[in-house]
């Protein structure tokens, strides 16, 4: 949506490419080494564009750059700088510290041959730039400096082709962080030569002598930008893509066809399409590729301002660090945190890295020979995983089938070639991913750790195909074996799936249980006159606020932090506190329903509610990470193509192609297509744009005399600078949404995923679980057994009298209360989320009660976040920390070597792990980078017949992404995982079809977790459940688990996890290595005898249930002679 009000801004007139010369300062080198992308055998290092690190503090990210010289008038264009810079000289100081991952350059070359990608070829007719001569001309020794280039989006093709002219005479001395640097402008060759004479293959004599041609930079651009863009646009001729981009920026050819004559159409033979379907698919492909290429350039060459993230010196972790060493430690931690998102993009089968295929998924319910409409075509064409069709035969512009030159790829499993393909065969990107894979957790599948141990021993044979036995501890071969079970499967079927992407979140988020329902508008609350004239709207949060105020007044929660703050002296006090809180919640629900009647709020308003959040689409939002800049461009290209499908399908259906050449048809339609697309994606519910107007389009400037400079002289002259375009659209954000209510249709009305099933819950699995665990010792001060064992014995009516439970009658009342609340809550629980604190208990109870009273009975979908944290790991599973090629003759020798290293001070390696975030909304207030699945749905307005977009939050496919995303093991049959939608987040506020049957991968940790949760849920354990958990967890382990592992096993029950970990530590202190149940029972002597007399709580239990265990007979929450307080307020 474009803003109704234009924003007027100004931008300086200067070139859009600069050469920076920095001193080789050790601290700067160490920081850049941590933040940059590099490959040990490549001289170019890709670094982030950050103020006070790689550019000066007052660097302008957007400029009016001179592009054409007409005598005394210069035409300028707006362009913004790419969020990366390229170090190309003096980089040996970086590379000597780089991790060796084997010969990735060779692997990338083989991948290009295998999958028909173009190879970069150095232009032998061009002279490479003499950087030593440039350094000398500015008074610097080339051996003592680092050189890097920053370039605008519009200038990247000029830089690639060596069509930029450095002007040493205009050198500027600037302060970059703590370093004094020199920057030299690079002007477009179009200012000195006729634009018609410029070409990436040939050049004039002036350009040959003066042009800045650095083949190593051109090579990086070729793969990092152009090959990657071509893959996403399904355009394999990278050189033609570069030529088209150069022509578009210089000659303003946005409204002409540039790519279609050279476009080929891949992935079609394997789809078994009819001739008409095939034609429709290719035509739509051509349209959306061309439109996206034109509009991406326009949107990137627009006005963008510096953001907080771009200022390196203002990062909290940099400002708070007292020493340089602390800065490096914090930056390394940040890099590890971000590896969670790298993992998701690599391991998710529906990742943006693999979604390069346009597929025709026909609607089987469509009648035979029925006419194809725009709607049916729009539903049929989808973006999907391309790995299964990388070297199939393809079609050309004349729709002729061309045989593939390379041999067919018979690999059904994900390999190093697929990974290199996902990286656009850019060695620096591939090296970065390998660095992350070397530090990711292993997910075992029945073989324990033997696979990685055996591989390390086999490395001594020096037969590695990637490194030839030079660096097997860190090479790509070892990395892929470590995480082999987590790699995505290559499916032969095409299916509609969301696309997983990593972006930066906006602050706005409306993501509570019912989202937009009952949320009073900001404008409405500010305009009392307008409010008086209309029916007031419901303010749901007013009633939640009443409950929060009650809690603060009664000291149930901390008034500032919102943390639990229950202060009670006895079980009766606790019961009274919770009873009073529940009464307060139910009164608030009653008032809310009364308010709904007054405001005429219907059930439909609830059912149509939306949860939503915004994602930042500005190019500088991910400037801190060159890798995520790489994926950012892919996201923008995919999103624009998805939006262009509406226009493309409409034109293909209404104006069919009758000739042979697709490009000829497209040329006839393109100007109309171009204009139609401009109006089709504004204000349509998904993409938000900002209209920007430049303050002045004509400026008088003292500027370089270009004609004089061409003759070898330098002088400044007064010129008139005219901006070729005054108003433009800028990328702002897009909105991702979710519908909490499942609206059944003909296909889903019997869907079991949302049908509420009545459950008999153990209190430790109910709504009070967090309180029972947290306050166990305070509730039962004399009790010597754990919370879990206590409740298991209560359920079994097997509590020995040798255990001091205090006053028996108080205990009976407390047990009765606990079961009553647990079962009452379960009857109305439509969210199926276990509260983790009082605030979440209040929110869930309020909404469950509200929806239950209104007559809702099915489960809702819910939003959840997994946030990254760093946890220690077993160093034996991380051979990268050996620092040298392994030469071990046996597994035992390797194990002993690692133990020796640990004894000599080797710290446990830290890796990123994901943990459930209790407050989903906090990831947006915490300014997070998030990874999520997105599916852009299109629907037609009944009134206007216009198409609108709905950015649907989707799933992340792939069992290897993270263990928290996988469904429960077979022992726990529920569909909760089908109703929960997850995003992966790292908070930076403090840092900155026919189904193919195949066996699902089950990881060892999931099997253990399933058994542990069965122990917790089971009502028939005859011994302390904590000991059963301990025995299950420690079985077949060669080291103790981390706290993070234990929290995963017990589903986040922190007190229980701590208790089990304390027992493990106690056993470790006693030097116990046998973790069988008999040993555990002998060590923990406080176990009671089964023959001891027991307390009789049988009157609280009733027999005869199907499962064979007791069900508590709870008293009704309302007396029979009283009318429920909520009944009067029902709609």
From Swiss-Prot:
A motif (Required for filament formation) lies at residues 790-791. Keywords: DNA replication, DNA-binding, Host nucleus. Residues 1112-1131 are annotated as: Required for nuclear localization. SUPFAM superfamilies: Viral ssDNA binding protein. It is found in: Host nucleus. The keyword NAD does not apply. This is Major DNA-binding protein. The lineage of its organism: Viruses, Duplodnaviria, Heunggongvirae, Peploviricota, Herviviricetes. The gene is DBP.
């Amino acid at each position: 949506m474009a803003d109704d009000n234009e924003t007027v801004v100004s931008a300086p007139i200067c070139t859009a490419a600069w050469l920076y010369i920095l001193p080789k300062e050790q601290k700067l080198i160490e920081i850049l080494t941590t933040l940059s992308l590099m490959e040990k055998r490549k001289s170019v290092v890709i670094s982030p564009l950050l103020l006070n690190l790689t550019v000066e503090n007052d660097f302008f990210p957007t400029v009016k750059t001179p592009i054409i010289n007409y005598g005394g008038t210069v035409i300028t264009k707006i362009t913004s700088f790419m969020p990366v810079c390229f170090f190309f000289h003096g980089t040996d100081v970086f590379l000597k510290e780089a991790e060796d991952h084997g010969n990735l350059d060779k692997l990338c070359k083989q991948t290009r041959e295998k999958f028909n990608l173009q190879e970069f070829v150095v232009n032998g007719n061009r002279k490479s730039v003499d950087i030593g001569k440039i350094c000398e001309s500015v008074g610097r020794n080339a051996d003592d400096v680092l050189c890097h280039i920053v370039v605008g989006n519009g200038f990247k093709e000029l830089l690639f082709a060596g069509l930029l002219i450095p002007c040493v005479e205009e050198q500027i001395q600037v302060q970059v962080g703590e370093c004094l640097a020199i920057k030299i402008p690079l002007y477009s060759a179009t200012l000195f030569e006729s634009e018609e004479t410029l070409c990436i293959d040939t050049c004039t004599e002036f350009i040959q002598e003066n042009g800045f041609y650095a083949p190593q930079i051109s090579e990086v651009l070729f793969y990092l930008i152009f090959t990657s863009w071509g893959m996403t646009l399904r355009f394999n001729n990278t050189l033609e893509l570069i030529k088209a981009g150069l022509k578009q920026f210089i000659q303003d050819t946005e409204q002409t066809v540039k790519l279609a004559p050279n476009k080929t159409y891949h992935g079609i033979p394997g789809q078994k399409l009819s001739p008409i379907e095939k034609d429709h698919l290719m035509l739509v492909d051509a349209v959306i590729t061309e439109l996206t290429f034109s509009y991406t350039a326009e949107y990137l060459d627009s006005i963008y301002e510096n953001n907080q993230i771009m200022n390196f010196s203002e990062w909290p972790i940099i400002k708070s660090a007292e020493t340089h060493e602390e800065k490096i430690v914090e930056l390394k931690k940040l890099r590890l945190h971000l590896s969670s998102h790298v993992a998701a993009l690599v391991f998710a089968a529906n990742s943006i890295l693999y979604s390069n295929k346009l597929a025709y998924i026909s609607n089987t319910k469509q009648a035979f020979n029925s006419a194809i409409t725009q709607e049916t075509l729009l539903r049929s064409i989808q973006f999907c995983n391309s790995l299964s069709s990388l070297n199939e035969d393809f079609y050309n512009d004349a729709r002729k089938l061309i045989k593939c030159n390379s041999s067919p790829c018979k690999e059904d499993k994900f390999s190093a070639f697929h990974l290199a393909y996902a990286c656009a065969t850019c060695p620096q990107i591939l090296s970065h991913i390998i660095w992350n894979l070397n530090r990711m957790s292993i997910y075992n599948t029945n073989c324990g750790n033997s696979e990685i141990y055996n591989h390390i021993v086999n490395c001594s044979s020096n037969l590695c195909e990637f490194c030839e036995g030079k660096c097997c501890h860190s090479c790509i071969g070892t990395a892929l074996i470590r995480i082999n079970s987590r790699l995505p499967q290559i499916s032969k079927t095409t299916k509609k799936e969301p696309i997983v992407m990593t972006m930066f979140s906006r602050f706005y988020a409306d993501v509570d249980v019912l989202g937009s329902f009952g949320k009073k508008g900001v404008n409405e609350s500010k305009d009392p006159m307008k409010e008086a004239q209309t029916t007031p709207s419901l303010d749901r949060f007013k009633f939640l606020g009443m409950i929060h105020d009650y809690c603060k007044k009664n000291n149930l929660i901390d008034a500032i932090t919102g943390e639990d703050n229950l202060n009670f002296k006895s079980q009766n006090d606790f019961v009274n506190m919770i009873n009073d809180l529940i009464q307060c919640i139910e009164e608030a629900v009653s008032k809310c329903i009364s308010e709904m009647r007054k405001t005429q709020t219907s059930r439909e308003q609830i059912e149509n509610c939306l949860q939503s959040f915004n994602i930042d689409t500005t190019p500088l939002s991910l400037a801190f990470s060159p890798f995520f800049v790489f994926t950012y461009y892919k996201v923008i290209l995919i999103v624009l193509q998805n939006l262009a499908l509406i226009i493309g399908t409409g034109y293909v259906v209404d104006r069919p192609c009758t000739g042979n050449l697709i490009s000829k048809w497209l040329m006839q339609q393109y100007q109309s297509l171009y204009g139609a697309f401009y109006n089709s994606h504004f204000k349509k519910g998904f993409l938000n744009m900002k209209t920007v107007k430049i303050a002045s389009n004509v400026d008088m400037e003292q500027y370089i005399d270009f004609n004089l400079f061409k003759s070898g002289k330098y002088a400044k002259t007064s010129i008139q600078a005219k901006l070729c375009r005054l108003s433009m659209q800028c990328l702002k954000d897009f909105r991702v949404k979710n519908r909490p209510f499942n609206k059944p249709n003909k296909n889903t009305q019997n869907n079991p995923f949302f049908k509420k099933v009545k459950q008999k819950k153990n209190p430790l699995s109910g709504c009070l679980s967090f309180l029972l665990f947290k306050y166990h010792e305070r509730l039962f001060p004399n009790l010597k057994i754990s919370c879990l064992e206590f409740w298991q014995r209560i359920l079994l009516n097997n509590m020995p009298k040798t255990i001091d439970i205090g006053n028996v009658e108080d205990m009976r009342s407390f047990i009765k209360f606990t079961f009553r609340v647990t079962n009452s809550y379960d009857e109305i629980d439509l969210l199926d989320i276990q509260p983790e604190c009082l605030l979440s208990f209040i929110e869930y109870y309020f909404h469950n009660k509200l929806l239950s009273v209104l007559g809702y009975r099915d489960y809702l979908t819910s939003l959840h976040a997994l946030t990254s944290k760093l946890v220690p790991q077993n160093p034996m599973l991380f051979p990268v920390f050996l620092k040298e090629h392994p030469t071990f003759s046996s597994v035992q020798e390797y194990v002993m070597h690692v133990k020796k290293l640990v004894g000599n001070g080797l710290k446990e390696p830290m890796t990123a792990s994901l943990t459930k975030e209790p407050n989903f909304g906090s990831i947006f207030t915490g300014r997070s980078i998030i990874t999520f699945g997105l599916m852009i749905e299109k629907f037609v307005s009944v009134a206007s017949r216009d198409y609108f977009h709905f950015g649907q939050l989707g799933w992340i496919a792939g069992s290897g992404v993270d263990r928290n995303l996988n469904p429960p093991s077979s022992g726990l049959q529920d569909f909760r995982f089908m109703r929960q939608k997850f995003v992966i987040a790292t908070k930076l506020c403090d840092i900155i079809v026919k189904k193919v049957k195949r066996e699902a991968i089950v990881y060892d940790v999931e099997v253990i977790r399933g058994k542990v949760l069965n122990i917790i849920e089971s009502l028939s354990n005859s011994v302390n459940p904590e000991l059963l958990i301990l025995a299950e967890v420690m079985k077949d382990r060669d080291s103790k688990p981390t706290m993070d592992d234990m929290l995963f096993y017990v589903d986040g029950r922190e007190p229980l996890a701590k208790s089990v970990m304390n027992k493990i530590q106690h056993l470790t202190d006693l030097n116990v290595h046998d973790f069988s149940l008999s040993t555990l029972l002998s060590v923990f002597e406080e176990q009671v005898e089964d023959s001891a007399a027991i307390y009789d709580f049988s009157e609280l239990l009733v027999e005869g249930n199907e499962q064979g265990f007791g069900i508590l007979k709870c008293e009704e929450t309302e007396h029979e002679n009283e009318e429920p307080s909520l009944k009067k307020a029902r709609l």
